[in-house]
Curated annotation (Swiss-Prot):
This is Quinolinate phosphoribosyltransferase [decarboxylating] 2a, mitochondrial. It is an enzyme of class 2 (transferase). Keywords: Alkaloid metabolism, Glycosyltransferase, Mitochondrion, Pyridine nucleotide biosynthesis, Transferase, Transit peptide. The gene is QPT2a. Expressed in roots and flowers. It comes from Nicotiana tabacum. GO terms for biological process: alkaloid metabolic process; NAD biosynthetic process; nicotine biosynthetic process; quinolinate catabolic process; response to jasmonic acid; response to wounding.
Length: 351
């Protein structure tokens, strides 16, 4: 089946349509790439330019001369198929973004998928193909794979962590690759996780440095409540706590004052033991103290091996920077159908 995404694209400067001209990229970028029909939509962001990110990735690859290897080796009129191949098991992600990139390079390329974002693939599975001008397929190949491999790696780890963390929800953090914040967080959603704050703008998060500068947890919370009221802002507020005493201080403040606080972070309350196990007694005590008055978030010493035990403490969320800051890319490839390419080459007397 052929499934195309509904968004507008024009012939990209990197694409080859007739003569091999090197054309520089347009400075015009569209922030609102159409994503309404996607099964898993990218998270909202007021300034993130997804089209611009795609264009930057293509531009840094093409440089000022374009693909000199393709120009030297691939006939400009050669048509071919190329198949996506999973080279290991995992969760596939980035299918929607791949279609956008192919359309950015050459809107005439036809992309067909046999899986959806979030589906499991196994080693050796051909999970999609692209048909059209061979030159333009190869131009898009590396950029498409760079995004898909990273996103699929994030989605694969997220799926494993989310399943193990149940009934708690797994979150990523702001520890994303620079410039890829939305893409990384999109992959987390595809993998079955939930998003933490997108940036510094959409949630107040009072951490240790803020608490130290304000003179304590209570004073920091009071300052935040005053700021939000004065500026008529309605956004979530989270405060970091590191000890049971700090949890008690937060709860005491909340019992005496109307507050915008929505979540309490329980940081490093998971203690590693010498035998490789973890002690979650402090975390469990904190969750019981809070007793559902606020959402809770466990942070620190979260791994695939520890997340299940953490999730059994009753905590609402578990956050892990490892989902995005040091993820292993999923090994996938895109290979041109050699026999078809040779057949076309023979017909055009170029093989």
């Amino acid at each position: 089946m052929f499934r195309a995404l509904p968004f507008t694209a024009t012939v990209h400067p990197y694409a080859i349509t007739a003569p091999r001209l090197v054309v520089k990229m347009s400075a015009i970028a569209t922030k609102n790439t159409r994503v309404e029909s996607l099964e898993v939509k990218p998270p909202a962001h007021p300034t993130y330019d997804l089209k611009g990110v795609m264009q930057l990735a293509l531009s840094e690859d093409a440089g000022n001369l374009g693909d000199v290897t393709c120009k030297a080796t691939i006939p400009v009129d050669m048509e071919s198929d190329a198949h996506f191949l999973a080279k290991e098991d995992g969760i596939i992600a980035g299918i929607a973004l791949a279609e956008m990139i192919f359309a950015e390079v050459d809107p005439s390329l036809k992309v067909e998928w046999y899986v959806n974002d979030g589906d499991k693939v196994h080693k050796g599975l051909k999970f999609g193909k692209v048909q059209g001008n061979a030159y333009n397929i190869v131009i898009a190949e590396r950029v498409v794979l760079n995004f898909m491999q990273r996103m699929s790696g994030i989605a694969t780890l997220t799926k494993e962590m989310a399943d193990a963390a149940h009934p708690a929800y797994i979150l990523e953090t702001r520890k994303t690759a620079p410039g890829l914040r939305l893409v990384d967080k999109w992959a987390v959603l595809i993998g079955g996780g939930k998003n933490h704050r997108m940036g510094l703008f959409d949630m107040v998060m009072i951490k240790d440095n803020h608490i130290s500068a304000a003179g304590g947890v209570g004073k920091a919370l009071k300052s935040v409540d005053q700021y939000l009221e004065q500026n008529k802002l309605q956004i979530g507020v989270e405060v970091e706590t590191r000890t049971i005493a700090e949890v008690r201080e937060v709860l005491e403040y909340a019992s005496q004052t109307k507050t915008s606080l929505t979540r309490i972070m329980l940081d490093n309350m998971v203690v590693p033991l010498s035998n490789g196990d973890i002690d979650v007694s402090m975390l469990k005590e904190a969750v019981e103290l809070i007793n559902g008055r606020f959402d809770t978030e466990a942070s620190g010493n979260v791994t695939l091996e520890t997340v299940h035990k953490i999730g059994q403490t009753g905590v609402t969320y578990i956050s892990s920077g490892a989902l995005t800051h040091s993820v292993k890319a999923l090994d996938i490839s895109l290979k041109i159908d050699t026999e078809l390419a040779l057949e076309v080459g023979r017909r055009t007397k170029r093989a």
